[in-house]
Amino acid sequence: MTSHGFIDESGTKDDHEVMTVALILFDGAFTAQKLHKLLIQELFPKQVKHDTKRDRRNSGLHYTDMSKSQRLKAAEILGKQPIQCFTGCFYHDGAEKSHERRFEIYTSLIELCLNDALEIHEHLDVSIAQQSNWMTYKAPLASDLSAIVSEKSARLGFRTAKFSFESAAKAG
């Protein structure tokens, strides 16, 4: 069975304390959208009830913008779901780094997450959140990730992974 996933990052700037990359895996192709809809219904019941375009525009699910009660409710809902999360992090030392160096770190964190996921899963379909200038790194990153899939296939048996790049703002 193919597991469907999404990779996104946080903290890529030098003044951020920690850079984090997460690969979230779902059992089904539409599980993320169903989960997003469930979270919206639970966290913003008035907006779902009125269901107007104006009401929906404020239903983004960014953790830092949620109240404590919304965070607890989201954790309760997510804790009951059959999802897996693979993460990697890098602690910034405060020194200024070039864009290329930050991108190397970002890439290594993605590779770490994928490597761990392929230890467990044989087939992955992964969307990667587009970062600035994503067209310039799409091909080399996909090539690096495909090399990891090949290495895991040689070591653990047949593995597949399909990669796509999607807007990070797209729900689900």
Regions found by a protein language model. Give the residues of each.
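Phosphate-ester processing/binding pockets and catalytic centers
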Residues: 1-172
